[in-house]
């Protein structure tokens, strides 16, 4: 990330009309999506960089504070309204040639390679997520398909999921702009030729980090992003993130978790 900061300064000097960076930074999971790989890269842990093994929040600890300071530093080279940028807005800014570098989920990448939607479709290169002092990690996320307990056709619904997500459909789905998480698809020559970012998805095997996977996560995510935004707007990182961690702890208890039952509260 330090190298990215240095590169952004050079881009701004040579292209003052362009925003060197456009990250998804808004609420609603956008900020944490951009931040999670940085958080792990600065030593906050993996695959869950948000809590310890007993589900005590650790967003106030030194690694996350350092990562938040780095993100605040990078904001010098983001749009003035960077905290309003969601996945689509960041992707559009990049596709229109208004930003030099973006971080986003792979599902958004076909858009920037399509000449009908992107002004830079023939000028795009892809790289792994930037690393931090403690290594380089990839953000892991996705969607879940399920079958309603009220369904009258559960077997047919399951067969549909099997068909849609099956290996035989992977290449066709990817070639039509879909997001496929299959080794066979990521290594398919036709897919790689059209969408050269696919091999980079295999970096997930080198180290990954993700969202929380516990019941009150949606509420906790909103709280975390609220306090990270406060830091991005200039509030003191240490005290602000401590306040956020205290609120997250209460929310975890309301959600049915009692971290103190399985381990001591960290400093």
Please place each PLM-identified region on the residue numbering.
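Periplasmic-binding protein-like
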Residues: 16, 161-184
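Glycine-centered hinge/linker elements that transmit conformational signals in sensory
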Residues: 6-10, 52-83, 125, 129
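Short helix-initiation/N-cap motifs at beta->coil->alpha
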Residues: 1-5, 82-96
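Short, solvent-exposed loop/beta-turn-alpha elements that line the ligand-binding surface or hinge
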Residues: 25, 42-66, 114-119, 127-138, ...
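A bilobed periplasmic-binding-protein/Venus flytrap-type ligand-binding module shared by bacterial periplasmic
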Residues: 140-153
């Amino acid at each position: 990330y330090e190298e990215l900061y240095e590169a952004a300064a050079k881009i701004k000097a040579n292209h003052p009309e362009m925003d060197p960076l456009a990250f998804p930074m808004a609420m609603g999971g956008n900020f944490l999506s951009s931040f999670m790989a940085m958080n792990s890269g600065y030593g906050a842990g993996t695959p869950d960089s948000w809590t310890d093994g007993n589900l005590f929040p650790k967003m106030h600890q030194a690694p996350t504070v350092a990562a938040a300071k780095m993100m605040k530093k990078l904001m010098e080279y983001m749009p003035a309204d960077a905290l309003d940028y969601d996945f689509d807005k960041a992707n559009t800014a990049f596709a229109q040639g208004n930003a030099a570098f973006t971080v986003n989920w792979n599902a958004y990448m076909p858009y920037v390679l399509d000449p009908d939607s992107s002004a830079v479709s023939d000028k795009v290169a892809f790289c792994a997520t930037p690393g931090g002092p403690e290594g380089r990690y990839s953000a892991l996320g996705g969607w879940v398909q399920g079958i309603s307990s009220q369904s009258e056709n559960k077997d047919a619904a399951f067969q549909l999921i099997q068909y849609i997500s099956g290996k035989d459909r992977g290449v066709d789905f990817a070639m039509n702009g879909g997001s496929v998480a299959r080794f066979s698809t990521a290594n398919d020559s036709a897919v790689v030729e059209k969408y050269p970012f696919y091999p980079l998805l295999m970096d997930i095997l080198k180290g990954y980090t993700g969202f929380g996977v516990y019941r009150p996560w949606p509420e906790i995510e909103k709280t975390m992003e609220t306090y990270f935004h406060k830091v991005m707007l200039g509030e003191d990182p240490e005290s602000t993130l401590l306040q956020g961690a205290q609120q997250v702890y209460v929310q975890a208890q309301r959600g049915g978790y009692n971290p103190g039952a399985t381990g001591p509260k960290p400093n």
